[in-house]
């Protein structure tokens, strides 16, 4: 500030000093905003990671199901939870990716859903029993969805 008020400078030089000070101030503000955005992204990524850890912990209980019906119910519930988390992750990505990036992600998501559902159908075909068919289908969907959640988490780096 003292430079801008220095009487030995011409009006033109004072104007240049003020412009440079404004540019510096703007750059500092922009850097601060970027740091805040990076921190928010890291916090959101950590929140997703924590939720995934909780779901993984819950998934460990599936192996202790007393019978196939309980295993089916637990696996179906797990799939729903992973699928909900996946939706939350896509909702978040919609806020941080640019339009082209998100459009690309959205297109790959639609293809991914088709692959997931097709894989689940194929898994179910490999058994005759209705409960076993449903279990195979949900197990495939749960595993495939879980893997996709981890891929999206990596995208958030």
Please provide the spans of the model-predicted regions:
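N-terminal alpha-helical modules
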Residues: 1-157
């Amino acid at each position: 500030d003292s430079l801008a008020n220095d009487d030995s400078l011409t009006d033109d030089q004072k104007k240049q000093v003020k412009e440079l000070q404004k540019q510096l101030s703007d750059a500092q503000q922009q850097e601060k905003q970027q740091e805040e955005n990076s921190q928010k992204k890291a916090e959101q990524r950590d929140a997703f990671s924590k939720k995934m850890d909780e779901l993984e912990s819950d998934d460990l209980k599936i192996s202790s199901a007393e019978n196939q019906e309980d295993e089916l119910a637990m696996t179906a519930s797990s799939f729903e939870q992973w699928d909900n988390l996946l939706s939350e992750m896509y909702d978040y990505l919609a806020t941080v990716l640019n339009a082209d990036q998100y459009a690309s992600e959205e297109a790959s998501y639609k293809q991914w859903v088709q692959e997931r559902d097709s894989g689940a159908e194929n898994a179910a075909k490999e058994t005759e029993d209705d409960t076993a068919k449903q279990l195979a289908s949900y197990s495939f969907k749960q595993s495939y969805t879980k893997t996709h959640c981890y891929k999206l988490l990596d995208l958030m780096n």
